[in-house]
């Protein structure tokens, strides 16, 4: 029995007594009179079904939309594309050492596959996924709840792993872990290389799933092509990086230089682990970040960002009237860095729009307004509870909601075809007393949300279709004395990031709101000439026959922060294909994971010679 199997068996047996059989499920609702919005055009599906996202070959024009080629990024594009074999200086491609390394590693893989096993076991389902070691580790870390701010257990798991393998390691007070492995035989003189990924995940779930993701393990499922979770985020971002690093540390057959595997905490909530990580003892000056989500893409730069928290205070008073409950859901959401240029709907802003329309149909006050769960994710659903205190017409309100639902169904028929708007009167015409914000404060809150910038602010003039600056409202939540809005500012230009922070400050001042800026991190700037990046691109081309796309991205990575801590640190970021990260629709491509892992092993072998 391997270390991880023993560790997890002990953990499961010790946690049996901690299970709570009386997990709280959703409260039963009293039947309520519902405005039949579903009978309106809000539920009308587009005449032409929108096809699912497809994986696009790296050499197509769509790939350029994700980023920009290396030549365009540094302004060195030539009129005639150089042959692939000319990537390596000096010897022709057929004599290049990289080609020898690729062939040698692949030959070892084939030899291992041809060795007859003493006893053949037929594996199915999750157990049959390849690479077996990578997905074995992925299953085990997925069984350990590890949402942001709840990573102590997985940090302990990594620490125990290092101890059992007699690897030197460091675990700091935040929970960051660095595990060092010696070079393989014959590679002791090679320069060390660092691998890096984060151990926290975004915890999002469908409303129908009662799971407590802080305490309960997610349920993995697969169709053989994709790995998903049952109505929750998968944690492929960045669990696949953790699994690959553990598999590499545990594999004595690979050829590699000395490895330093850096596991950071709380990346998803402002790169907090990377902020606090002491890298003074790091020997590596080359780092492979494993937090990218497109196979065949080598990321060389990313935007910087900051979390902005705006608070609007308000006084609650006792109000007598009839309550209307409104809900908007069915949106696609997504990572606010990667999907902000897709034009997807923001549930918080849609709800603010509807409340603004309803102001002309009667006087009401806000009891509650809540939407979104993560500052770095586009909100998929939002809900509000309001109380009408003056004269109003139910029929006019019904018509307003239905018309609004019809309007947004048309607006977002391509990006969010499943938007649903519902509104109901829970008290069925009876008035009652409730504590709500005053009319003036309610109007101020709605207008602040309406005035708040959102989406792509400016596109890059250098990199086609890549946002340069953006702002995404992620969370709106009601407190006892006001509402709180969490947003994410991103920009590849630090001065423009500051401009957006100043712009938000001006809006907040006009609405008498306070502002707090947290989790600021710098942009990871492009290194124009990188031998390490060139080697990574060359190895990929030799291995696959496809030239990789070297790009910049609008999402945030830890590379910028880490590179600032280690002078001369040259970083790249790679990863397998993942889709819909930060949403319950998140999925990880299994064949892509296998290819990426093979590429990583060959690249490490090449680094042993470089």
Region locations from a protein language model:
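Acidic/His- and Gly-rich active-site-bordering loop/insert found
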Residues: 123-226
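A short beta-alpha structural unit
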Residues: 139-143, 374, 385, 420-435, ...
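A glycine-rich helix N-cap at a beta->alpha junction
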Residues: 277-303, 403-409
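Active-site-adjacent substrate-binding region
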Residues: 346-369, 526-569
């Amino acid at each position: 029995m391997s270390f991880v199997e023993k560790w997890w068996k002990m953990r499961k047996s010790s946690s049996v007594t901690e299970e709570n059989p009386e997990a709280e499920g959703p409260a039963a609702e009293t039947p309520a009179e519902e405005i039949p919005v579903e009978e309106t055009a809000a539920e009308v599906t587009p005449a032409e079904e929108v096809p699912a996202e497809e994986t696009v070959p790296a050499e197509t024009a769509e790939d350029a939309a994700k980023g920009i080629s290396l030549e365009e990024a540094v302004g060195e594009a030539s009129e005639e594309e150089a042959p692939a074999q000319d990537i390596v200086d000096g010897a022709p491609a057929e004599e290049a050492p990289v080609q020898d390394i690729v062939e040698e590693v692949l030959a070892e893989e084939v030899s291992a596959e041809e060795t007859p096993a003493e006893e053949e076991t037929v594996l199915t389902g999750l157990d049959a996924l390849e690479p077996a070691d990578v997905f074995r580790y992925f299953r085990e870390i997925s069984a350990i709840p590890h949402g942001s701010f709840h990573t102590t257990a997985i940090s302990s798991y990594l620490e125990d792993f290092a101890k059992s393998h007699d690897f030197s390691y460091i675990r700091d007070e935040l929970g960051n872990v660095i595990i060092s492995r010696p070079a393989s035989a014959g590679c002791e003189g090679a320069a060390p290389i660092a691998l890096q990924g984060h151990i926290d995940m975004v915890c999002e779930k469908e409303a129908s799933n009662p799971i407590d993701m802080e305490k309960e393990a997610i349920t993995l499922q697969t169709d053989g092509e994709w790995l998903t979770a049952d109505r929750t985020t998968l944690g492929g971002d960045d669990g696949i990086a953790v699994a690959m690093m553990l598999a590499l540390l545990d594999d004595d057959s690979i050829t590699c230089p000395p490895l330093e595997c850096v596991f950071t905490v709380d990346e998803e909530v402002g790169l907090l682990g990377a902020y606090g990580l002491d890298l003074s003892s790091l020997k590596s000056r080359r780092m492979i970040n494993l937090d990218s989500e497109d196979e065949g893409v080598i990321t060389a730069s990313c935007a910087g960002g900051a979390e902005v928290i705006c608070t609007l205070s308000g006084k609650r008073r006792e109000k007598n009237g009839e309550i209307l409950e409104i809900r908007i859901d069915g949106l696609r959401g997504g990572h606010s860095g990667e999907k902000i240029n897709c034009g997807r709907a923001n549930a918080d802003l849609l709800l603010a729009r509807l409340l603004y329309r309803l102001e002309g149909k009667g006087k009401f006050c806000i009891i509650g307004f809540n939407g979104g769960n993560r500052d770095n994710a586009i909100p998929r659903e939002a809900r509000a509870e309001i109380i009408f205190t003056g004269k109003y017409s139910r029929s006019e309100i019904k018509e307003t909601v239905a018309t609004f639902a019809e309007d947004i169904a048309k607006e977002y028929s391509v990006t969010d075809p499943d938007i649903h708007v519902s509104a109901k009167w829970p008290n069925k015409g009876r008035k009652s007393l409730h504590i709500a914000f005053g009319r003036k404060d309610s109007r101020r809150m709605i207008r602040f949300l309406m005035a708040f910038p959102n989406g792509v602010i400016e596109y890059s003039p250098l990199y086609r279709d890549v946002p340069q600056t953006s702002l995404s409202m992620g969370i709106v939540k009601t407190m006892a004395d006001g509402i709180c809005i969490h947003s994410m500012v991103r920009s590849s230009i630090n001065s423009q990031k500051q401009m957006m922070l100043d712009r938000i400050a001006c809006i907040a001042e006009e609405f008498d709101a306070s502002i707090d800026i947290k989790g600021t991190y710098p942009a990871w700037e492009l290194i124009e000439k990188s031998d390490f990046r060139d080697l990574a691109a060359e190895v990929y081309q030799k291995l696959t026959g496809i030239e990789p796309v070297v790009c910049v991205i609008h999402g945030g990575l830890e590379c910028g922060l880490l590179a600032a801590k280690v002078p001369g640190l040259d970083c790249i970021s790679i990863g397998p294909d993942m889709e819909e990260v930060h949403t319950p629709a998140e999925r990880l491509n299994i064949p892509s994971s296998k290819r990426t892992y093979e590429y990583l092993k060959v690249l490490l072998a090449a680094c042993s010679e470089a």
